C-alpha cells in the first residue's frame, strides 16, 4: 500500500527525476497525506516489533495483547477509511491518488478480520478494567525497553511526583512560567542534552531516552515534559546542518541550559 502511494505521489510532484517545489506546493494534500500514511505504517511495524520482542521474552500478557490488537484494528481501519490529520482534515487514500481497486487490494482476509474483530468495545473495556486494576504500575503493560531506560524512567517519575505534580496546578491557574529552579534542576539531570553527542557536552543517549524523559515529566505537567524537546529539535537541526563553529558554540550551551 505504501509503495503504491509513493508511486502515486511521485507521478504528481516529480519532474526530470527530482521533486518540484511548485508541484509539492500544488499537491500538498497528497504530499502531506503520504507522510501521515508512512508514519502509520511505521508505527504498526514498530508495534509488531514490540509485540514479538515481548513474546520472545515471555512478557506478552493480556494487557500487551489488547494494546497490540486495538492498535492494529484502529490504525488499519483509519488507513482504509480515512486518517484524521486534524479535527477538520481527513486524509483519504484517493486524495493521494490511489484508485478504488488499489484501495480494495489492501483489504485482504487477514486485514478484514483485524479491522472487524480487533478494536471492539469489549476489547477496549477489558483493557480499561486491567488498567484500573494495575493503576499503581508506572506504565500500561511492559514497555520492552532495556534496563537503562527503565532506570531513567523511574528517576524522572520520582522527580515529577516530588517536584512537579504538587505545584503544577497552581502554575497553571496563575499562568506562571516554569520556575528557573526547576529548569536548573532539569539541566543538572541532563534533560537538555540527552541526545547531544558527548563531545559537545551532551549525554549521547538515544532518542528513546528523550521520549521516556518527556513522558515521565509530562505526567507531572505537560509543559515541563515539553521543555527538553525544544533543545532536542534545535540540536538535531544544528548537528545535521550547522557548521562546526556553530556546533561548538551552541550545543554545549543547550546541554547546560546556559546562554550561548
What function would you assign to each model-found segment?
Residues 36-39, 46-52, 74-77, 215-219, ...:
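Short glycine/serine- and small hydrophobic-enriched flexible loop segments
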Residues 18-38, 59, 63-70, 143, ...:
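Short, solvent-exposed segments of well-ordered alpha helices
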Residues 74-158:
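Intrinsic disorder at enzyme termini
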Residues 89, 158, 165-260:
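Glycine-rich flavin
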Residues 44-75:
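Short secondary-structure subsegments characteristic of cysteine-rich extracellular domains
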Residues 3, 32-35, 39-42, 66, ...:
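Generic structural signal for well-ordered, non-transmembrane alpha-helical segments
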Residues 1-55:
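Extended amphipathic alpha-helical segments enriched in small hydrophobics
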Residues 1, 6, 106, 115-119, ...:
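FAD-binding core of flavoproteins
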Amino acid at each position: 500500500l505504501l509503495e503504491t502511494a509513493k508511486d502515486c505521489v511521485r507521478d504528481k510532484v516529480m519532474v526530470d527525476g527530482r521533486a518540484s517545489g511548485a508541484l509539492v506546493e500544488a499537491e500538498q494534500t497528497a504530499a502531506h497525506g503520504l507522510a501521515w500514511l508512512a508514519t502509520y505504517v511505521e508505527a504498526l511495524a514498530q508495534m509488531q516489533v514490540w509485540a514479538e520482542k515481548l513474546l520472545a521474552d515471555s512478557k506478552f500478557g493480556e494487557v500487551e495483547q489488547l494494546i497490540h490488537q486495538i492498535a492494529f484494528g484502529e490504525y488499519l481501519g483509519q488507513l482504509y477509511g480515512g486518517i484524521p490529520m486534524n479535527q477538520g482534515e481527513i486524509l483519504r487514500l484517493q486524495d493521494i491518488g490511489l484508485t478504488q481497486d488499489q484501495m480494495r487490494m489492501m483489504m485482504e482476509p487477514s486485514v478484514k478480520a483485524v479491522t472487524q474483530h480487533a478494536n471492539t468495545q469489549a476489547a477496549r473495556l477489558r483493557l480499561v478494567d486491567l488498567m484500573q486494576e494495575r493503576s499503581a504500575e508506572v506504565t500500561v503493560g511492559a514497555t520492552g525497553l532495556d534496563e537503562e531506560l527503565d532506570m531513567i524512567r523511574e528517576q524522572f517519575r520520582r522527580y515529577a511526583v516530588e517536584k512537579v505534580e504538587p505545584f503544577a496546578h497552581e502554575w497553571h491557574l496563575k499562568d506562571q512560567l516554569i520556575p528557573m529552579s526547576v529548569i536548573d534542576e532539569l539541566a543538572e539531570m541532563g534533560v537538555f542534552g540527552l541526545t547531544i553527542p558527548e563531545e559537545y557536552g551532551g549525554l549521547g543517549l538515544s532518542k528513546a531516552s528523550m521520549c521516556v524523559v518527556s513522558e515521565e515529566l509530562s505526567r507531572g505537567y505537560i509543559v515541563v515534559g515539553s521543555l527538553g524537546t525544544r533543545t532536542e529539535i534545535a540540536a538535531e537541526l544544528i548537528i545535521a546542518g550547522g557548521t562546526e563553529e556553530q556546533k561548538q558554540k551552541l550545543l554545549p550551551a543547550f546541554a547546560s541550559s546556559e546562554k550561548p
